[in-house]
């Protein structure tokens, strides 16, 4: 079983409802071990939109990275994600942040996530649940990357 870290976010409609539905669907093919606190953050990229609720989860999977990506895209669609524009509003967004300590660079899948160490809504929730995680490209602890922390705790840990 591979250890995977996913970043989830929502900034449209009933954000908590979308998040809970996504977790429920992910549990059909992942063994979720830890979930970070849910944080509220400003949108990244295209900033003229609602704030996101973001968190990170740690899970075990028997799926290969590309299989996992396909299942995640299916979950996003089933939960209600509508395709808009790059960095636009999202009912649910699920990113593969890390898959074991692998480095994957294909047209459809980039692991670790290309902006992992730059986005506070990835770094701080991930460090909350895995304080000693190593960035597989730089081979340095993620805690050495300190993007400006603009996160506001939104609510408690949802469930494990």
From Swiss-Prot:
Pfam hit, one: HPPK
Gene3D superfamilies the UniProt entry points to: 7,8-Dihydro-6-hydroxymethylpterin-pyrophosphokinase HPPK
PROSITE patterns: HPPK (PS00794)
Alphabetical GO biological process terms: folic acid biosynthetic process; tetrahydrofolate biosynthetic process
Pathway in which this enzyme or protein is active: Cofactor biosynthesis; tetrahydrofolate biosynthesis; 2-amino-4-hydroxy-6-hydroxymethyl-7,8-dihydropteridine diphosphate from 7,8-dihydroneopterin triphosphate: step 4/4
Alphabetic keyword roster: ATP-binding, Folate biosynthesis, Kinase, Nucleotide-binding, Transferase
Cysteine pairs bridged by disulfides in the record: none
Keyword field contains Lipid metabolism: no
UniProt enzyme class: transferase
Domain of life: Bacteria
An example molecular function term from Gene Ontology annotations: kinase activity
Reactions listed under catalytic activity: 6-hydroxymethyl-7,8-dihydropterin + ATP = (7,8-dihydropterin-6-yl)methyl diphosphate + AMP + H(+)
EC annotation from Swiss-Prot or TrEMBL: 2.7.6.3
Function per UniProt: Catalyzes the transfer of pyrophosphate from adenosine triphosphate (ATP) to 6-hydroxymethyl-7,8-dihydropterin, an enzymatic step in folate biosynthesis pathway.
UniProt record similarity statement: Belongs to the HPPK family.
Protein's name in the database: 2-amino-4-hydroxy-6-hydroxymethyldihydropteridine pyrophosphokinase
Species in which this protein is naturally found: Aquifex aeolicus (strain VF5)
Gene name of the encoded protein: folK
């Amino acid at each position: 079983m591979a250890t995977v870290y996913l970043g989830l976010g929502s900034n449209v409609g009933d954000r908590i409802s979308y998040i809970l539905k996504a977790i429920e669907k992910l549990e059909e093919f992942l063994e979720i071990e830890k979930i970070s606190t849910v944080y509220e953050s400003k949108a990244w990229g295209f900033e003229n939109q609602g704030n996101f609720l973001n968190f990170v989860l740690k899970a075990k999977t028997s799926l290969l990275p590309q299989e996992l990506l396909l299942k995640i895209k299916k979950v996003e669609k089933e939960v209600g994600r509508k395709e808009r524009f790059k960095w636009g509003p999202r009912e649910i967004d699920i990113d593969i942040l890390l898959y074991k300590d692998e480095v994957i660079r294909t047209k459809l899948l980039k692991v670790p996530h290309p902006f992992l160490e730059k986005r506070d809504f990835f770094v701080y929730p991930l460090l909350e649940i895995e304080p000693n995680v190593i960035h597989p490209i730089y081979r340095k602890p993620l805690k050495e990357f300190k993007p400006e922390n603009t996160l506001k705790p939104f609510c408690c840990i949802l469930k494990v």
